[in-house]
Protein backbone atom coordinates (compact mmCIF):
# COMPACT_ATOMS: atom_id res chain seq x y z
CA UNK A 1 0.00 0.00 0.00
CA UNK A 2 1.25 3.49 -0.77
CA UNK A 3 2.46 5.55 2.17
CA UNK A 4 1.69 8.85 0.50
CA UNK A 5 -1.70 9.77 -0.89
CA UNK A 6 -4.40 7.42 -2.12
CA UNK A 7 -5.07 7.87 -5.83
CA UNK A 8 -8.76 8.11 -6.69
CA UNK A 9 -10.48 5.95 -9.23
CA UNK A 10 -10.47 7.29 -12.80
CA UNK A 11 -13.72 8.65 -14.19
CA UNK A 12 -14.98 6.63 -17.13
CA UNK A 13 -16.31 8.57 -20.12
CA UNK A 14 -19.93 7.72 -21.02
CA UNK A 15 -20.44 5.85 -24.28
CA UNK A 16 -21.06 8.05 -27.34
CA UNK A 17 -24.41 6.59 -28.47
CA UNK A 18 -26.45 6.31 -25.25
CA UNK A 19 -24.43 8.43 -22.81
CA UNK A 20 -24.25 5.64 -20.23
CA UNK A 21 -21.16 5.04 -18.08
CA UNK A 22 -22.36 1.50 -17.37
CA UNK A 23 -22.51 0.69 -21.08
CA UNK A 24 -19.05 2.24 -21.61
CA UNK A 25 -17.70 -0.06 -18.88
CA UNK A 26 -19.39 -3.03 -20.57
CA UNK A 27 -17.75 -2.13 -23.90
CA UNK A 28 -14.37 -1.96 -22.15
CA UNK A 29 -14.87 -5.40 -20.60
CA UNK A 30 -15.85 -6.88 -23.97
CA UNK A 31 -12.93 -5.22 -25.78
CA UNK A 32 -10.07 -7.49 -26.92
CA UNK A 33 -6.59 -6.26 -27.96
CA UNK A 34 -7.62 -2.59 -27.64
CA UNK A 35 -10.17 -2.80 -30.47
CA UNK A 36 -12.78 -0.52 -28.95
CA UNK A 37 -14.68 0.33 -32.14
CA UNK A 38 -15.21 -3.39 -32.81
CA UNK A 39 -16.42 -3.93 -29.24
CA UNK A 40 -18.78 -0.94 -29.54
CA UNK A 41 -20.20 -2.29 -32.82
CA UNK A 42 -20.83 -5.69 -31.19
CA UNK A 43 -22.52 -4.16 -28.12
CA UNK A 44 -24.70 -1.76 -30.12
CA UNK A 45 -25.76 -4.53 -32.51
CA UNK A 46 -26.59 -6.81 -29.57
CA UNK A 47 -28.59 -4.04 -27.86
CA UNK A 48 -30.51 -3.39 -31.08
CA UNK A 49 -31.46 -7.07 -31.30
CA UNK A 50 -32.32 -7.13 -27.59
CA UNK A 51 -34.55 -4.05 -27.89
CA UNK A 52 -36.42 -5.56 -30.85
CA UNK A 53 -37.01 -8.84 -28.97
CA UNK A 54 -38.06 -7.35 -25.65
CA UNK A 55 -39.95 -4.31 -26.95
CA UNK A 56 -38.18 -2.13 -24.37
CA UNK A 57 -35.67 0.69 -24.71
CA UNK A 58 -32.04 -0.35 -25.29
CA UNK A 59 -30.69 0.79 -21.91
CA UNK A 60 -33.77 -0.40 -20.02
CA UNK A 61 -33.39 -3.93 -21.40
CA UNK A 62 -29.64 -3.88 -20.66
CA UNK A 63 -30.25 -2.70 -17.06
CA UNK A 64 -32.83 -5.46 -16.51
CA UNK A 65 -30.41 -8.14 -17.75
CA UNK A 66 -27.65 -6.73 -15.55
CA UNK A 67 -29.96 -6.59 -12.49
CA UNK A 68 -30.75 -10.29 -12.83
CA UNK A 69 -27.05 -11.23 -12.90
CA UNK A 70 -25.75 -8.91 -10.12
CA UNK A 71 -24.64 -10.93 -7.06
CA UNK A 72 -25.43 -9.63 -3.55
CA UNK A 73 -23.12 -11.98 -1.61
CA UNK A 74 -20.00 -13.94 -2.47
CA UNK A 75 -17.51 -16.11 -0.59
CA UNK A 76 -13.92 -15.17 0.22
CA UNK A 77 -11.28 -17.55 1.55
CA UNK A 78 -10.18 -16.85 5.12
CA UNK A 79 -7.40 -18.80 6.79
CA UNK A 80 -8.02 -19.48 10.48
CA UNK A 81 -5.69 -21.70 12.49
CA UNK A 82 -4.44 -23.93 9.71
CA UNK A 83 -7.75 -24.41 7.92
CA UNK A 84 -9.31 -22.29 5.20
CA UNK A 85 -12.96 -21.24 5.44
CA UNK A 86 -15.16 -19.87 2.69
CA UNK A 87 -16.59 -16.80 4.42
CA UNK A 88 -19.69 -15.15 2.90
CA UNK A 89 -19.31 -11.38 2.43
CA UNK A 90 -21.55 -8.75 0.90
CA UNK A 91 -20.46 -7.48 -2.53
CA UNK A 92 -19.82 -3.76 -2.95
CA UNK A 93 -21.99 -2.02 -5.62
CA UNK A 94 -19.10 -1.32 -8.03
CA UNK A 95 -17.94 -4.94 -7.82
CA UNK A 96 -21.54 -6.15 -8.34
CA UNK A 97 -21.65 -4.40 -11.70
CA UNK A 98 -18.16 -5.56 -12.67
CA UNK A 99 -18.90 -9.21 -11.82
CA UNK A 100 -22.26 -9.16 -13.61
CA UNK A 101 -20.75 -7.70 -16.78
CA UNK A 102 -17.80 -10.11 -16.69
CA UNK A 103 -20.10 -13.11 -16.24
CA UNK A 104 -22.36 -12.02 -19.12
CA UNK A 105 -19.36 -11.59 -21.47
CA UNK A 106 -17.86 -14.96 -20.41
CA UNK A 107 -21.19 -16.72 -20.93
CA UNK A 108 -21.66 -15.06 -24.34
CA UNK A 109 -18.18 -16.15 -25.44
CA UNK A 110 -18.96 -19.78 -24.54
CA UNK A 111 -22.20 -19.84 -26.55
CA UNK A 112 -22.26 -21.60 -29.93
CA UNK A 113 -24.06 -19.01 -32.06
CA UNK A 114 -22.66 -17.48 -35.26
CA UNK A 115 -21.51 -13.94 -34.44
CA UNK A 116 -20.46 -12.43 -31.12
CA UNK A 117 -23.22 -9.81 -31.41
CA UNK A 118 -25.83 -12.58 -31.67
CA UNK A 119 -24.26 -14.53 -28.79
CA UNK A 120 -24.25 -11.40 -26.62
CA UNK A 121 -27.85 -10.55 -27.57
CA UNK A 122 -28.98 -14.10 -26.72
CA UNK A 123 -27.16 -14.06 -23.37
CA UNK A 124 -28.57 -10.63 -22.48
CA UNK A 125 -32.12 -11.71 -23.38
CA UNK A 126 -31.67 -14.92 -21.34
CA UNK A 127 -30.41 -12.84 -18.41
CA UNK A 128 -33.41 -10.50 -18.73
CA UNK A 129 -35.68 -13.56 -18.46
CA UNK A 130 -33.75 -14.91 -15.43
CA UNK A 131 -32.21 -17.85 -17.25
CA UNK A 132 -28.92 -18.57 -18.99
CA UNK A 133 -25.34 -19.26 -17.95
CA UNK A 134 -24.65 -15.88 -16.33
CA UNK A 135 -27.73 -16.15 -14.08
CA UNK A 136 -26.74 -19.73 -13.21
CA UNK A 137 -23.31 -18.43 -12.17
CA UNK A 138 -24.94 -15.90 -9.83
CA UNK A 139 -27.18 -18.62 -8.37
CA UNK A 140 -24.11 -20.82 -7.77
CA UNK A 141 -22.30 -17.99 -5.96
CA UNK A 142 -25.38 -17.31 -3.81
CA UNK A 143 -25.79 -21.02 -3.05
CA UNK A 144 -22.13 -21.22 -1.99
CA UNK A 145 -22.59 -18.22 0.34
CA UNK A 146 -25.77 -19.75 1.79
CA UNK A 147 -24.02 -23.08 2.42
CA UNK A 148 -21.19 -21.33 4.28
CA UNK A 149 -23.40 -19.00 6.33
CA UNK A 150 -22.08 -20.68 9.50
CA UNK A 151 -18.68 -19.03 8.91
CA UNK A 152 -20.11 -15.50 8.56
CA UNK A 153 -18.68 -14.52 11.97
CA UNK A 154 -15.14 -14.81 10.50
CA UNK A 155 -15.74 -11.66 8.47
CA UNK A 156 -12.98 -9.05 8.58
UniProtKB/Swiss-Prot annotation:
Functional note: One of the primary rRNA binding proteins, it binds directly to 16S rRNA where it nucleates assembly of the head domain of the 30S subunit. Is located at the subunit interface close to the decoding center, probably blocks exit of the E-site tRNA.
GO cellular component, one term: small ribosomal subunit
Protein name (Swiss-Prot/TrEMBL): Small ribosomal subunit protein uS7
CDD domains reported for this sequence: uS7_Bacteria
Organism annotation: Photorhabdus laumondii subsp. laumondii (strain DSM 15139 / CIP 105565 / TT01) (Photorhabdus luminescens subsp. laumondii)
Family: Belongs to the universal ribosomal protein uS7 family.
GO MF entry, a single one: structural constituent of ribosome
Pfam families, A to Z: Ribosomal_S7 (PF00177)
Stored HAMAP family: Ribosomal_uS7_B (MF_00480_B)
Complex and partners: Part of the 30S ribosomal subunit. Contacts proteins S9 and S11.
Gene that encodes it: rpsG
GO annotation terms (biological process): translation
Keywords attached to this entry: Ribonucleoprotein, Ribosomal protein, RNA-binding, rRNA-binding, tRNA-binding
InterPro entries given in the database record: Ribosomal_uS7, Ribosomal_uS7_bac/org-type, Ribosomal_uS7_CS, Ribosomal_uS7_dom, Ribosomal_uS7_dom_sf
Amino acid sequence: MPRRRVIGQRKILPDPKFGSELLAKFVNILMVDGKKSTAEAIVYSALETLAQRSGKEHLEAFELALDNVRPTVEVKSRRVGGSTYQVPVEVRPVRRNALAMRWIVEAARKRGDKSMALRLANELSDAAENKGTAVKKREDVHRMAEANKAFAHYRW
